[in-house]
Structures are given as C-alpha cells and as structure tokens.
Amino acid sequence: MKLVEIIRGETTDDETVARAFDYVLALGKLPIVVNDSRGFYTSRTFGTYVMEGAAMLGEGIPAAVIENAAVQAGLPVGPLAVLDETALSLSVHVLDQTRADFAAEGKTYEATSGELLVERMVKELKRSGRVAGGGFYDYPQGGKKQLWPELKTLFEKPGVEWNVKDIQDRLLYRQSVETARCLAEGVLTSVHDANIGSIFGIGFPGWTGGAMQFIYGQGIDAFEQRCAELAAKFGKGFGLNAEAKAAIRNFQPNY
C-alpha cells in the first residue's frame, strides 16, 4: 500500500510527527497525519464502505449487482470481495471488542445491519472469508472465485426494488459523510489528507479527486440534499449533523 497513516497521540510533539513524516517520504510512501481515535481515518471510513455493501445484501439486493455497481463507480473491488479478503472474522472481532468497550463505559453499541449480517455469516453460517476457505465467495482450487450460491437463497428477495444509482451513491456518499465527520471531530485536520488518504488508503475512486473533493464536486448544497434523501431511505449513516456541515464549509479550499 502506498499510504502510511501517521497517528498523533495526545502527547505527540511536532518534532516527532515531522520525523515520522520525513521517514515515510524516505521510504517512498505517501504520509498523512491523523489524530488518535477509534479506527483512525482509513479503517473507520473503509468500514463504512464494506458494511454498506453488506447492508444492501441484507436488504435483498443481489450480490452480483452490488459488486458490479461498485466497480462501475470506480472502486477497485466490490465491498463483499474486500470483506472476504480482509476476513469477515476480523470484522466480527472488531464488533465484539467495540461492544465490550461500550459496555465498559456503561453504554450499548448499536450494530449496523451490515455488521449484523457479517456476524451471522461468521457465527451462524461459518463463512469467515477467503483465508478460511470461503465467505461471500467460493474459491475453487485452480479456478476463479465465484459468489457463494447460497447468498441467493439466504438473502435475495424477489421483487425487491433497487437501482444502480442508489447503490453507487450509497457506497460513495457513505464514505464521504464519514470523512466529513472525521474532519468535524478533529481526526482529520485537512482536506488534503482526507483526499489523499481516501484514494490511496481505501480505494476511493480517483476520478472524484478524493472523498472531500467528491463533496465539493457535487456542490455542497446538492451533496447535503442527496444525503438527506439517502438518510430518509437508508438510515442515519448518511445523516450530516451541524458540525459535519460546518466542517465541509470551513475546510473548503479556495482556488
């Protein structure tokens, strides 16, 4: 991977960050600097992409449609294929730890529909990903991977309404919304790092210019309106609070 995410802790001084930055450049990599937070930037935002794909599968949208729509939108790999490669079991471990951390603080973590589907794949259906022999895909020895046939039986719903535009927007907008939230929360401190990190760290389509540039390319008002439409249809993951809206405007570059 070209990108290296440098994590600044509460007591990390500027000299240490600068040394790390120079070292990463010397290695021929692309550095970005983010502040310490759960999932940092790239893992946190990448998670929204793959879990949105899983959520759509749970809604009854055919797996092949989801995967093909993602690639057609410019994403390098479909969300279900990525989950297989990174291991569904890893996502479930993260979910279990998140629940435990919230419980330790006296809170209850509300898992997304995508997370619950992945949990079912691992714990009930025993499909943990490529390393375990199969997840959303089967991996025949000496052959090309193919979608697990049981996905059709288990999840597809005849007559469910879907369109490619909504699928692609859900995959792209969900990541841009999370990026705006990271800016609002101070996890990210620049649009530059957001754009570089999203393209080289999580495969956000290069044609967009990055997750934040995607917002500015749509037009802020149009982006906010589309987010409201998606939130009304597909859930609060697309919601922009006042802080995120302010961050989008306050960080907008002046060219």
Positions of the model-derived regions?
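N-terminal glycine-rich phosphate-binding loop for ADP-containing cofactors
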Residues: 1-255
